């Protein structure tokens, strides 16, 4: 059932979490992303020093899936090298398409692995990841 995966307690907790919400005044890069088909919006703020994401926040509005995905993503990337993050984005994309992916790399992001079973919601999940990819392209090459 769609509601079991998408609205599990853990996913609701991530969607409602304030831990990664807000702006970063000292952000290295800011990127906006929108899902025009459903109205989800996100603005990512990344602080990158010496090729490592030191801090990250987001502002956004949208469904539980898009907001939980953004929180899980930021939890996963803080402390990682930009080069490794491009690889994480690729793994998240594979997961969303139902392809083989490295669960160990994605860690808690795998809470949303059932998204592959709900094609209409994949765009909601992937919005944060696509926005992250565009942000990182501004400061590095994949």
UniProtKB/Swiss-Prot annotation:
Belongs to the NifU family. Gene3D superfamilies: 3.90.1010.10. It holds the Pfam family NifU_N. GO terms for cellular component: cytoplasm. Forms a heterotetramer with IscS; each subunit of the IscS dimer contacts an IscU monomer. GO terms for biological process: intracellular iron ion homeostasis; iron-sulfur cluster assembly. This is Iron-sulfur cluster assembly scaffold protein IscU. GO terms for molecular function: 2 iron, 2 sulfur cluster binding; ferrous iron binding. SUPFAM superfamilies: SufE/NifU (SSF82649). A scaffold on which IscS assembles Fe-S clusters. Subsequently gives the nascent cluster to other proteins. It is likely that Fe-S cluster coordination is flexible as the role of this complex is to build and then hand off Fe-S clusters. Disulfide bonds: none annotated. InterPro entries: NIF_FeS_clus_asmbl_NifU_N.
């Amino acid at each position: 059932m769609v509601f079991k995966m998408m609205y599990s307690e853990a996913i609701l907790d991530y969607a409602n979490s304030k831990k990664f919400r807000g702006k970063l005044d000292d952000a290295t890069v800011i990127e906006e992303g929108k899902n025009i088909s459903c109205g989800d919006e996100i603005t990512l703020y990344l602080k990158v020093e010496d090729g490592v994401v030191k801090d990250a926040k987001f502002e956004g509005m949208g469904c539980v899936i898009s907001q939980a995905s953004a929180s899980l993503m930021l939890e996963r990337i803080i402390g990682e090298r930009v080069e490794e993050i491009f690889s994480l984005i690729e793994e998240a994309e594979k997961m969303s398409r139902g392809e083989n992916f490295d669960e160990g790399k994605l860690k808690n992001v795998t809470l949303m692995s059932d998204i592959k079973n709900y094609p209409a919601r994949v765009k909601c999940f992937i919005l944060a990841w696509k926005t992250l990819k565009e942000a990182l392209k501004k400061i590095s090459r994949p």
